[in-house]
Amino acid sequence: MSITKVPKKVVTLAYGCQMSERDADTLTEISSQKGYVRSQELEQADLIIVNTCCVRESAENKILGKIGELKHLKEANPQLKIAISGCMVQQPGALERLRKRAPHVDIWAGTHNIHEFQRLLEEAEEKGKVAEVWEKPRETQESVLLAAKGKLKAYVNISYGCNNFCTYCIVPHVRGRERSRQPEEILAEIRALVETGCREVTLLGQNVNSYGQDLDRAYDFADLLKDVDSIDGLWRVRFMTSHPKDLSDKLIETIAAGTHLCEHIHLPFQAGSDEILKGMNRKYTREYYLSRIAQIKVIIPQVSLTTDIIVGFPGETEEDFEQTLELIRQVRYSQAFTFMYSKRSGTPAAQMAEQIPLDIKKRRLQQLITVQNAQSLAWRQEMIGKTCEVLVEGPSKSNPDRLTGRTRGYELVVFPGEAQLIGTLVQVLIQDANSWTLFGECRADRH
């Protein structure tokens, strides 16, 4: 009589940006090579991986709370392995502090050595606890693993790190200086993903617009987009994040000319005041940013623009804040990701005078959200009566009886439809809208 071996289960939790999600997928795939299968049930897991974020204090507090919650699972199942990785662990001096706070964790890894996770997991299984954080990246290595194989949508790293050093941002300190992947490696990964069923890729980098500046040949982000656009079987190409100072006319024209390059640009402006932009070390002015927006709208008239905004940066006056609100009204973003400034240890902004009180930051954030919600609603209401191409992603989270997907402009659409439409491109007539969602009726499918 043969005994069927029950596979071990891994649950991976990702916090923070899309790059953190991509790293979490990589860690999951590495675990699968050790025989683990993906699961969503923490109580049944044999391995729990938490890939962390440290961009804002609120994110860190949420992660620390989750790590604390895992302690009772470890007590109930001493064979359970818990691994914590990513940006929070990579911060200078963080490892010792975190290990003292969470002695139940088995594996600690930073951002530079996630491709070493199989070795770390083996060491933890054989010897017990292991902690390894590389101070600097030793190589630009992207695993051949297809971290998102079989998925409709995938994130693909094109570069790592950042050279901009915005004064509020911890990312260059935990991700290192900018390193571009070789284009052949990126294109090979995307082609392989398409073979497994992927139809949309999002190219990731802290600043995709500066991709290629460290390569040994003249090859920039626009060149990469052209090559990705030509891959057979790929329906959509997105990218993030773009730094305004590096957004060239060549890049805008490439997006406009592309077949599969989505008419959506995420272009963070962060603040509408030149004084605050200077303090942030953003390396552009309000006027320059608006000139880039104007050029985008001329070359890509149907473009959907999204952005990131920070309120309450040190020294921000009411006049500075009003300039931010005015810029929002002028540009008309379809969506904005809004945040209160969060002091990050080790960044120049953390040492600046005139730190803004929390109550003022909260008030400004609420004002900002109110203004942007009105802009988002107006943008979406203008789409009522139009027919949009939608990539169907799955059941709606708010109403499982309906399907959901996104337009090329990244607008979320909810509509009635059968499950067999998932993974296809359909035409949806937009009939209603709120500030966040379009509602419609499926008229035809393309693929």
UniProtKB/Swiss-Prot annotation:
Function: Catalyzes the methylthiolation of N6-(dimethylallyl)adenosine (i(6)A), leading to the formation of 2-methylthio-N6-(dimethylallyl)adenosine (ms(2)i(6)A) at position 37 in tRNAs that read codons beginning with uridine.
Segments forming domain TRAM: 381-444
Recorded coiled-coil stretches: none
SMART domains to which the protein is assigned, alphabetical: Elp3 (SM00729)
Protein's recorded name: tRNA-2-methylthio-N(6)-dimethylallyladenosine synthase
Cofactor entry: [4Fe-4S] cluster
Taxon lineage: Bacteria, Bacillati, Bacillota, Clostridia, Eubacteriales
Main location: cytoplasm
Record-annotated Radical SAM core domain positions: 148-378
Record-level Gene Ontology MF annotations: 4 iron, 4 sulfur cluster binding; metal ion binding; N6-isopentenyladenosine methylthiotransferase activity
Species of the source: Desulfitobacterium hafniense (strain Y51)
Record-listed E.C. numbers: 2.8.4.3
Residues bound to [4Fe-4S] cluster 2: C162, C166, C169
PANTHER family, per database record: CDK5 REGULATORY SUBUNIT-ASSOCIATED PROTEIN 1, MITOCHONDRIAL TRNA METHYLTHIOTRANSFERASE CDK5RAP1
Reaction it catalyzes: N(6)-dimethylallyladenosine(37) in tRNA + (sulfur carrier)-SH + AH2 + 2 S-adenosyl-L-methionine = 2-methylsulfanyl-N(6)-dimethylallyladenosine(37) in tRNA + (sulfur carrier)-H + 5'-deoxyadenosine + L-methionine + A + S-adenosyl-L-homocysteine + 2 H(+)
PROSITE patterns recorded: MTTASE_N, MTTASE_RADICAL, RADICAL_SAM, TRAM
HAMAP family: tRNA_metthiotr_MiaB
Annotated family: Belongs to the methylthiotransferase family. MiaB subfamily.
Cofactor info, note text: Binds 2 [4Fe-4S] clusters. One cluster is coordinated with 3 cysteines and an exchangeable S-adenosyl-L-methionine.
Domain (MTTase N-terminal): residue spans on this chain: 8-126
Pfam families referenced in this protein's UniProt entry, alphabetically: Radical_SAM, TRAM, UPF0004
Subunit structure: Monomer.
SUPFAM superfamilies: Radical SAM enzymes (SSF102114)
UniProt GO cellular component terms: cytosol
Residues the record lists as binding [4Fe-4S] cluster 1: C17, C53, C87
Record key words, sorted: 4Fe-4S, Cytoplasm, Iron, Iron-sulfur, Metal-binding, S-adenosyl-L-methionine, Transferase, tRNA processing
Record's subcellular location: Cytoplasm
Keyword Nucleotide-binding in annotation: no
